[in-house]
Regions:
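Short amphipathic alpha-helix used as the core "switch/output" element in two-component signaling
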Residues: 61-74, 230
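Short regulatory alpha-helical coupling segments
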Residues: 130-131, 144-163, 194-201
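Hydrophobic framework residues that shape the active-site pocket
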Residues: 174, 193, 208, 213, ...
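A short pre-motif secondary-structure segment
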Residues: 204-207, 246
Length: 312
């Protein structure tokens, strides 16, 4: 387990590092709280923070609150506050500000090691729970709820200087694949598509449900179309052999964030563009600015939604 240790005294840092069993944990020592925060923000491998109450720049209590806010609910971090005083008010304050444990300073060696073993167990369990709660088990991509949580934040942070585009796509004739080759083959398709997407982009990628996926990319419309084309070709190149050889294609709709857009609005335009790709031959990319979003598109899309439980 990687541990961020914060204390203004280098002597205390060295002594604490020596107390921790070598080989079981890696200690990153800091004299200032802000430097520790920067490390935690940049390194997802840090799973524990041990801090003294008195620091050179901010207090240990402030560091607790800032670190807890930084990692949020999507990353495990076990926080231990240590102090040489027996001030129970300080214990309460630390726990109320995000600490998980409180220990005397200097700690008894066996007590410190036992608490770190507990922290290791808890953060590993939390990591698994977070994974199960935020990812789609079949594809390894973000699940619908987590995707929309991240997408809303991305839309709120978008502006003319930081473009954002949505690439919405689904598997062509996926129901036929399940009906013809069986659901095991359908699952294999979804797993392979997830693997393609994880290597194709560093954007926000989620499975919205069934055979529908979305990628939010920090780029303008033209670049997003290029990304979509690259993904389309990669998916088209996939080959499956069970129970007999077959391939798949996907249809893509691309839309760029516009001032005042919510995630629902940008996905609506991408959705209509994707239906246009379906309606004009499948296995293609359609950008939302390449055709007028007329009432006819809305009417056709509404009919398709009503008459077909699954897109083809």
């Amino acid at each position: 387990m990687r541990i961020a240790l914060v204390d203004p005294s280098r002597a205390i840092q060295r002594a604490m590092t020596e107390l921790i069993v070598p080989g079981e944990h890696e200690v990153l020592a800091f004299s200032e709280g802000q430097k520790a925060l920067n490390c935690i923000g940049a390194d997802d491998g840090v799973r524990a923070l041990i801090t003294s109450v008195q620091l050179a720049d901010i207090s240990g209590i402030q560091l607790c609150a800032a670190a807890r806010k930084l990692v949020g609910s999507r990353r495990p971090l076990f926080i231990i506050v240590m102090s040489s005083t027996n001030d129970y008010g300080l214990v309460v304050q630390a726990l109320d500000n995000g600490a998980d444990d409180f220990i005397r300073k200097p700690p008894f060696p066996e007590e410190l090691r036992a608490r770190l073993r507990a922290a290791d167990r808890l953060t590993l369990m939390q990591r698994d729970l977070i994974k199960y709660a935020t990812t789609d088990s079949l594809t390894g991509l973000l699940n619908r709820r987590t995707f929309f949580d991240d997408a809303v934040k991305a839309c709120n942070g978008a502006d003319s200087a930081s473009p954002l585009s949505a690439i919405l796509f689904d598997i062509d004739q996926f129901k036929r694949i399940n009906d013809t080759y069986g659901h095991q083959a359908g699952d294999a398709v979804l797993e392979s598509l997830g693997a393609v997407m994880r290597t194709a982009s560093s954007g926000i990628i989620g499975r919205l449900g069934g055979e529908e996926f979305c990628l939010l990319q920090s780029c303008d419309l033209a670049d997003a179309v290029e990304v979509a084309e690259s993904v389309r070709r990669s998916i088209r190149a996939l080959r499956f052999t069970q129970p007999e050889p077959f391939g798949i294609t996907c249809s893509f709709g691309v839309a760029e964030w516009e001032r005042g857009d919510t995630i629902d609005r940008i996905l609506r335009r991408a959705d209509i563009a994707m239906y246009e790709a379906k309606n004009t031959g499948r296995d293609r990319v359609v950008a939302s600015d390449t055709f007028a979003l007329t009432d006819q598109h809305e009417k056709w899309r509404g009919i398709a939604r009503t008459t077909s439980p699954r897109r083809q």
